[in-house]
UniProtKB/Swiss-Prot annotation:
GO molecular function terms noted in the UniProt entry: acyl-[acyl-carrier-protein]-UDP-N-acetylglucosamine O-acyltransferase activity
One Gene Ontology cellular component annotation held by this UniProt entry: chloroplast
Protein name in UniProt: Acyl-[acyl-carrier-protein]--UDP-N-acetylglucosamine O-acyltransferase
Intracellular or extracellular location(s): Plastid, Chloroplast
Subunit structure: Homotrimer.
Chloroplast keyword on record: yes
Entry keyword annotation includes Heme: no
Functional summary from the UniProt entry: Involved in the biosynthesis of lipid A, a phosphorylated glycolipid that in bacteria anchors the lipopolysaccharide to the outer membrane of the cell. The target for the lipopolysaccharides produced in the chloroplast could either be the cell envelope of the eukaryote or the plastid membrane.
Pfam families for the chain: Acetyltransf_11, Hexapep
GO biological process: lipid A biosynthetic process
Pathway stated in the Swiss-Prot or TrEMBL entry: Glycolipid biosynthesis; lipid IV(A) biosynthesis; lipid IV(A) from (3R)-3-hydroxytetradecanoyl-[acyl-carrier-protein] and UDP-N-acetyl-alpha-D-glucosamine: step 1/6
Reaction equation(s) it catalyzes: a (3R)-hydroxyacyl-[ACP] + UDP-N-acetyl-alpha-D-glucosamine = a UDP-3-O-[(3R)-3-hydroxyacyl]-N-acetyl-alpha-D-glucosamine + holo-[ACP]
Amino acid sequence: MTNIHSTAIVHPAASLGRNVVVGPYSIIGSDVSIGDYTRIGPHVVITGKTVIGCNNQILSGCILGSVPQDLRYIDSELTGLYIGNNNLIRENVTVHRASGNGVTYIGNNNLIMVNCHVAHDCQIRNNIIISNSVSLAGHVIIDSCVIIGGHAGLHQFVHVGALSMIAAMSKIEKNVLPFVVVSGMPAITRTINLVGLKRYGISKTDINYIRLMLENLKVQPLAFDTYSIFKKFKSDNLLKRNVAVQYFSDFLFNSFRARGFIPFKVPKK
């Protein structure tokens, strides 16, 4: 049975599923849809064209689906926010709807901690942990199984590869390669994310291929011909066409065409 606190304001046109809980003083707008068993804490505002799936927990003070901080945004744009299932969104998180007829997207099984900001048009996949006070600028993409440490800041249009880890207080201005650990201001790629790869059951064979690809990128990091390395990945018989290699090489190629990727630490001479 749906339970709406007497002080909450839920627009009659809003769609609430079975056993939804809406806490004290929360406000649910007219274009909002909330799936079964989702719990909304006190003092939460959900507005705009926002769709929230099932079994989510949204704690006090969150503001979801509000107008993007984009000076080009026009009120008539049909933008929205989509949040999947089984997400835990902690206190005072802000998530803005998209601009330019797009959708801000948050997938499934994510933990977004206190005071985080997810800007317009961000795409957050699945099984991601975003620690306290992380700020994602517009159009950031985070692939699945990423961990982001507290107070990190991500530049707009950055793409974070799967199974990577960003250390606390890092400044992310370029793409983060899959399967690595980055840290620093500005960030530097430090090492392979071996703990994360093992945790998600990546095979030893795939880990060895990933190590080999990363070692290739470490060679003369300030002078290598990135396109030649990409072609080597595509043609080298040693790198079999498994999922990890395909994903890494595609990510690398797209990074060359866009923002580039965070470089490796250069050893001191």
